[in-house]
Amino acid sequence: MGFSMFFSPENDVSHHSSPYASVDCTLSLGTPSTRLCNEDDERRFSSHTSDTIGWDFLNGSKKGGGGGGHNLLARRCANCDTTSTPLWRNGPRGPKSLCNACGIRFKKEERRASTARNSTSGGGSTAAGVPTLDHQASANYYYNNNNQYASSSPWHHQHNTQRVPYYSPANNEYSYVDDVRVVDHDVTTDPFLSWRLNVADRTGLVHDFTM
């Protein structure tokens, strides 16, 4: 009885159960079901991470390529095939298809062609803006001025020329000269005829004016 006070059954149970009541061995050991769940979660996380990285990489390449052109293919001039130029200019193959030098030349040729088309459609001006004379008009102007000068000049008249005989005292023979007569006045203008009409025919010479 004396020892029962110190060693009661309740104290004995609590003394023996306290070191083992707080320990759960099942939680520390992984069962097959818990191991499968953990492996599935790891697979899903890894696959999601790889998909995210791949999508971000593709989006990054698209954003970078949209601003400065395709990174793998360098831009080339459509005319001289150069890849380095301070400025890309518009050309016949589209925007930014020519280098700076070729673009300037192309622009000059385009302006020159448009100026030539405008001058051709207008018909009265050249590329420099200077009016050109019509060939037919200039020819008519030249012809009319010459005719006006000919009609006003006393040396230009319409003549009728015919062969007439005249006597040469030096050779004692008759020769033929051109008898030039003005149509309007019917006056002989040949200086030889002024004295030819006053020469008397010699009896020793026979001539026929009807021939």
From Swiss-Prot:
Gene3D superfamilies xrefs: Erythroid Transcription Factor GATA-1, subunit A (3.30.50.10)
CDD domains, per database record: ZnF_GATA (cd00202)
Domain of life (superkingdom): Eukaryota
Positions of the UniProt region annotated as Disordered: 111-131
Cell compartments where the protein resides: Nucleus
Zinc finger motifs (GATA-type), residue ranges: 77-102
Induction per the UniProt record: Repressed by HAN.
Keywords for the protein's UniProt record, in alphabetical order: DNA-binding, Metal-binding, Nucleus, Transcription, Transcription regulation, Zinc, Zinc-finger
Gene Ontology biological process terms in this record: flower development
Null mutant phenotype: Effects on sepal fusion, petal number, fertility defects, and carpel abnormality.
Description of how the protein assembles with itself and partners: Forms heterodimers with GATA18.
Name under which the protein is recorded: GATA transcription factor 19
Organism: Arabidopsis thaliana
